[in-house]
Amino acid sequence: MLQLVLAAPRSGSGKTTAACALLVALTARGLTPCAFKSGPDYIDPMFHRAVLGVESHNLDLFFSAPQTARALYARHAAGHGAAVVEGAMGYYDGLGGVTDTASAWQLADTLDLPALLVVRPKGASLTLAAELRGLTAFRTPHHIAGILLNDCTQGLCALLKPMLEKETGLPVVGCLPPLPEAAIESRHLGLKTAAEIDDLQHKIQLLSDAAQQTIDWPLLHTLFDRPAPAAVPCTLPPPRVRLAVARDAAFCFTYAETLEALRENGAELCFFSPLADTALPDNIGGLYLPGGYPELYAARLAANAPLRTAVKSAVQGGLPTVAECGGFLYLGRTLQDADGTPHPMAGVLPGQGFKVGRLVRFGYARLTARADSMLFRAGETLPVHEFHHWDSTENGDAFTAAKANGRQWACGFANAHLYAGFPHLYWAGTSLPKRFAAAAEHYIKETS
């Protein structure tokens, strides 16, 4: 089974486009690949899903213990002929920007997988070799097994390949040529989502077609084939309660592992669109409003008054509810759009969402509960992350969030039927899904 971590010396090297090109090319070669993403990123897995038509999974060593990450990898790699784990940021960049904790390198080390390094050679030649030698000397073992030159012509690849192999001892498996027509646009939270790019499949197909011609596939298999990991089968229990889960262009930031954890605890997930649907799904015991881009769709969300009213009535009536980041903004009184115009939202919470124009609170943190609530017990601490350019006039004070550098702030609303706040939660391997499902079951019994 071909297995690799696709990493890079730094962000902006083209890891996501390279991953998608490899995934489509591997599919064309009959290997039925699966995809993973190192770290908390929501958007890159959307590209993997758009390319493959199957779930892509996050593997994050800040959120998860090593054994949990290994189990998730083994479970979702089972039955596939190839697995591509896309790294985040630079290869060794981890928690706080000054450690290798939760880095792509640490994930490669935890999973015992070789890494394929995506390198853009523009503006350097022999210096690339010096940089690569530094990367291989920085940690032992470094796990780097090969180099893929990105945005590199075949002529330049032919020139650089023998020099790089001689100077670094690392094989060059080929290149991905410059393809301006396959460029993928970005926005304030990174790349645009896969659903927003009409010609995504065409762009990825161009990259895949190029990869078929410019990558040494026998060499790739020699370097990265290894026995498939042993997986423990997961059997889902019969559903005991229905949960409404928002899913559309405005609310698209969900972890596949979170949804799986809910199903493993007896939840049937009923997806709905706050943009298009005028009512919540029937017979639900809970509501999950994930993050996304509600600020870009504020006018449309406001125009759907029946759904806003239904959500307000349900939450105020005690429906167990989880609202993360964008979902939290939706529960507020108003939300500014990208132009700064405020629009009415559900009005469950007192805050008004407004545009800041820069990252407000960014990165990993640890969230500690100040009191018992639906999801948390007083004093419990859970790893979370934040990533947003909008803020609220009322962020709540049910929790204390703390970063590794010592910075702390109060945040979040919580009670016996609610969690709402900017911090994104990762549910796999925690008590959260069990508690949410139990609260939903209790609600159904009490209201039946």
Residue ranges and their predicted role:
Residues 239-316:
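Phosphate-binding active sites in nucleotide-utilizing proteins
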Residues 2-111, 119-143, 151, 155-158:
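ATP-dependent carboxylate-amine ligase catalytic core
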Residues 108, 214, 237-239, 251-264, ...:
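C-terminal and late-domain segments of enzyme folds
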Residues 125-235:
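Internal gly/pro-rich beta-alpha loop/helix module
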Residues 1-2, 236-242:
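A short, charged/proline- and glycine-enriched loop
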Residues 5, 84-86, 116-118, 148, ...:
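Structural motif
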